[in-house]
UniProtKB/Swiss-Prot annotation:
Keywords: Cell membrane, Chemotaxis, Flagellar rotation, Hydrogen ion transport, Ion transport, Membrane, Transmembrane, Transmembrane helix, Transport
Similarity comment: Belongs to the MotA family.
Transmembrane segments: 6-26, 32-52, 150-170, 184-204
Membrane topology note: Multi-pass membrane protein
Self-association and partners: Each stator complex is composed of 4 MotA and 2 MotB subunits. 2 A subunits and 1 B subunit are thought to form a single ion channel, so that each stator complex contains two channels.
Protein name: Motility protein A
UniProt subcellular location: Cell membrane
Gene designation: motA
Pfam families named in the record: MotA_ExbB (PF01618)
PROSITE patterns in the cross-refs: MOTA (PS01307)
Amino acid sequence: MDVGTIIGIIAAFLLILISILIGGSITAFINVPSIFIVVGGGMAAAMGAFPLKDFIRGVLAIKKAFLWKPPDLNDVIETIGEIASKVRKEGILALEGDIELYYQKDPLLGDMIRMLVDGIDINDIKATAEMALAQLDEKMSTEVAVWEKLADLFPAFGMIGTLIGLIQMLRNLNDPSALGPGMAVALITTLYGAILANAFAIPVANKLKKAKDMEVLVKTIYIEAIEKIQKGENPNVVKQEAAIMLGVELPEEV
């Protein structure tokens, strides 16, 4: 688990809360109708922008933002190097006993190793793996898009709520004493929208995008590495190319 997102979001809300408490009573910043407009309206509009199944999956993907663990890039490189070395020394069938281990490291890698051991043509293996990767990319991109849409809609509905409040306030211009409190209530929805977007939805969307980009990159490297390994390329070269793609500097002796 990468705790950065959890710490960041909690810290943002705490700092806002502390600032409110220092300036006065927190009750002045609580308005239930405003919450309904911003949260309910934003969620409803986002639901209308996606197929229901995609929207639900996207919202539930919030767990990934908090629980996703970045892959160990050095382990990815070492795994590729080990596979390449074993194939070069003992042949492809030597990988059969380690298929379950490769599945644990990455399901797509496990699938490719299994197909390789089964003697399936490398072009078919690559095509199947790329198709699976494209489906994963599309799925994770939709999850990111849901949260990016929420980040856009929360402030928009905050403004809608503010306009509603202003209209209601202007209907009571005959009572000047009510203008100040009315304006304050009207602006609360804008505040809610800004907070939810910038302190919550945007961080979640960015974390999901980071997870997607890293997952796609690692799996792409596995696909290219397996192709090179099957063609008998030098293990050190395969390993070095993977390290370059991942931005990892290998020891000079490798």
